[in-house]
A protein has these predicted regions:
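N-proximal low-complexity "stem/linker" segments adjacent to membrane-targeting elements
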Residues: 1-27
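Alpha/beta-hydrolase active-site loop signature
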Residues: 14, 43, 70
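Short aromatic/hydrophobic "clamp" motif used to bind/position activated sugar donors
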Residues: 87
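Catalytic metal- and UDP-sugar-binding loop of GT-A-like glycosyltransferases, i.e.
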Residues: 67, 90-92
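Glycine-rich, basic loop-to-helix element that forms the pyrophosphate-binding segment
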Residues: 66-82
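Acidic donor-binding segment of Leloir-type glycosyltransferases
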Residues: 23-64
């Protein structure tokens, strides 16, 4: 049976207040072969702290920081390191 890996890309800029809910929705999926790449697009809020909590809970969460470059730039940075056969964008 084919069980492809899904790469979920979550670009974040000043969305810390929504990040936990978005990442919890990923964790609650019934399909388990995924990685979730949280891309902090230079947020001055506490996005990094929240993301690091999730990374420490589950190795399928990956954190990436980059200088602010906008939504497309953040998505592309996540896609560049994605290992999945399919890409799923998810906005926090």
């Amino acid at each position: 049976m084919h069980n492809p890996k899904i790469s979920i890309i979550v670009p974040c800029y000043n969305q810390a207040q929504y990040l936990t809910e978005a990442l919890q929705s990923v964790l609650e999926q019934t399909y388990g072969n995924w990685e979730c790449i949280i891309v902090n697009d230079g947020s001055p809020d506490n996005t990094e702290e929240i993301a690091q909590e999730w990374v420490s809970k589950d190795s399928r969460f990956i954190y990436l920081y980059k200088e602010n470059g906008g939504l497309s730039s953040a998505r592309n940075a996540g896609i560049a390191i994605a290992e999945g056969e399919f890409i799923l964008p998810l906005d926090a």
